[in-house]
Amino acid sequence: MANRGVTGLWPHQYEAADLAFRGRNVIISTGTASGKSLAYLTPAVAACFDGGTVLYLTPTKALAADQLRGLRELRITQVRAACFDGDTPFEERTWIRQHANYVLTNPDMLHRSLLPRHSQWSSFFRRLRMVVVDECHGYRGVFGSHVAQILRRLRRVCSRYGSRPTFILASATASEPGVFAKRLTGLEMDEVTTDSSPKGSTTIALWEPPLTELRGEGGAPVRRTATAEAADLLADLVLANVRTLAFIRSRRGAETVAMSARAKLQDVAFSLSAHHTGSHRHPHIGHSHARHTTSSHGHPAPAAPTERTTAQDDADPSMPHEPRPPASLNRGSADASTGTGVSAGTGASAGTGASTGTGTGVSAGTGTGASGGTGTGASASTGTGTGTGGVSKPKADTDLSAAVTDLSAAVTRSAAAHPSSLSLTPAENLRDMAGPHAATDIDAAAGPGATADLSGMADQATPAAVTDPAAPIGGLRDGAELQDAAELPDKIAAYRAGYLAEDRRLLEKALRSGTIMGLATTNALELGVDVSGLDAVLIAGWPGTRASLWQQAGRAGRAGQDALAVLIARDDPLDTYIVHHPDALFGQPVEAIVLDPDNPYVLGPHLCAAAAEIPLTEDDLPTFGDTAADVLADLVSQGLLRRRPNGWFWTKRERATDLADIRGGGGTLIQVVESSTGRLLGSVDEPSAHTTVHTGAVYLHQGETFLVEHLDLDAGVALVSGAAPDYSTFARDITDISIISAHRSHPLGPGTLHFGEVEVTRQVVSYLKRRIQSGEMVGDEPLDLPPRTLRTRAVWWTLPADVVAPLAEQGFDLGGSAHAAEHAAIGLLPLFATCDRWDIGGVSTELHADTGQLTVFVYDGHAGGAGFAERGYARATDWLTATREAIASCECDRGCPSCIQSPKCGNGNDPLDKRGAIHLLDTLLTSPSTSTT
């Protein structure tokens, strides 16, 4: 390690390593790039030196490959490290089982291979000294519940071979890490949470894409999509030599963003080849149309300008290839300047002194000082100052990419002269921004409707504005050579699960080396992969949790340099709420990680797997939790296990591990096959097939577009053919729900809040076609697919008829009001529970058969529940208050995707009553809820 420049340990690294050396189970939860790897690597390598073995678990293959690369660079002959995952050639697996003493794998392989074949790994398990669970915050929801049971099975197998390994868990972002770690492993845990590592600053920008002139369902305004903005930004940043990761919510979206960004750079390459006159500066995408204003210094300043598929990502009204100037974004530009005031907004100005700006974009601020401006786009400055923000919507001709490219240039040029003044948020690292103490530093964070007060810097000398007209805004830095124009498009690629292993490793290497400057990726690269030298991260859509947001933002700046992270809002209630309420992000702790190992739908399959590995005994039951005995009895009654005097035995010839789909897809796999060639393109789980490869669906695979000719669920195949439709598709379903039992209830205003077990019946009934270039709906085609039944858990609230009668008398549509409130509530729940809106569903009705009252349900989309609805029950007042605020603060008249419309509504977003939903929620929230009974 000394040969690699490691001369000592930071205090938090030493503390965690020391606990592990003493045999204490420990979780280290510190900031991104804080050196957690060294904290567990030190005792792990020592274990190998002493003749022991180490098992390293990670959620992703990419992280395991990255860790293996780092281990091999140490050149320690006593450490025989190897990856054992689905990409490992079969001819290498025997050697790994017999000789490797540091095995890097994932929960899937542990579940399906290592534990069922534990006798083949007996030497490894007998000497197992340490289990490293890296990026453990990724183990949440149903997936986390499965992993918790897999770890319990691992402990049981180790006990069979006489070993009691020490567990070290690592996470950059975890709330109550010790509590979570105990729930995940079933073991008592020490925790290390004090981060003593040095950090560069990260500028966080919140961006709401502009409205277009188009109209969607019900005449609602259409906003430019987050993926379209991300593609433009990615192209612009790559053109500026800014190494960038763009996180996209879906595989299809990642492919589309990469294709679009490459197309834009192709246009730029053509323009450069045709018009280059010897200058070493690149033309900025769209700058030829930028307006300019003057900052307070008199310098000319540019004028104001998320693994599942989401409809917003894929139905894109402004992706390639629109007829416009070469790679033009045609949205103007924005100003980024440093000063003693901080203003982030759609005003065109920011300068030294406190500043005044109004508008929208990254954020809008008002205050007093030397400069003021109005406009659209983004403006950011750093320094000290206070203010309050206003909110309005940007126009379609604003330029996001110019804003952020100029902002990234500002970060670069200001770092040397004024390093302490560089940050829209004053926290020293992302963990501080996410921590509860950050509220003392942040008066209001950078985002629409906010300005930031950088505490402790009020007495600093005023730095010069960074919008120097001599600086190459949006182009290469002075002195850089012109890139080969023909190679520009090759600087961008896509990265996602489903690629061949060698292709993924080549992409990771190319990004590290700088051969690739921009990568559009799913969350496959969110965790831990060390890609030093990244300058910027684009996040297209709220990634689901604050933990994921800070984790993705932390991918940039890992080498200690300053960095830029941009959250681009999708057109849905949650994203819109966040960019208009940045206090929901900054100064807030990360969410509690929700998992439920006792879920019988999770526990049952793992008890079967455990019995198949080693027959279960009474002594094993405490390992699997308090409900294990009841679940075992049920498994015996189903004939899956047989009770004998000496324990429970697996009775089937099939593999018991096949009962548990730990990634939560469920059902059999549907093979996607090209009809003309028989080529296997990929596979999707059966529930997802109803919405992604139904007959008539548009299917994307590695940059190719296909049309689904026929979906045969019985045969398990979807036949597709190459096509180039000018539309995208997304499915719509209808849902019915019945109450099995209410576990808990308490009054909420004049109504009642419940949590309990329900049965949900869903059926995909049609799919929408949306024109790619314009975003307009061009068809709603019927489908004939079978219904699917799900027994799960839900939170629901009811209001009696005499309470809602006055609303009906005022002319509000009660069904439409409940429907609108349901949509918005689904959209906002991920802010309070560790979930995605696609992990949950909802049903609303003016009169439900089981309650006899107006009822709104929100349910977990996983069999047996995943803890999301229960979290909503616990936070109901906060959740529904935020829901009401999100609807009321939206500027539309009758409802739009930013507030009450849902892309997955099987009723075509009809009826919806926006004003009625506000009044309905006001009625429900008229008095605080009482304690739970």
Predicted regions and their residues:
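Conserved pre-motif I regulatory segment
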Residues: 1-29
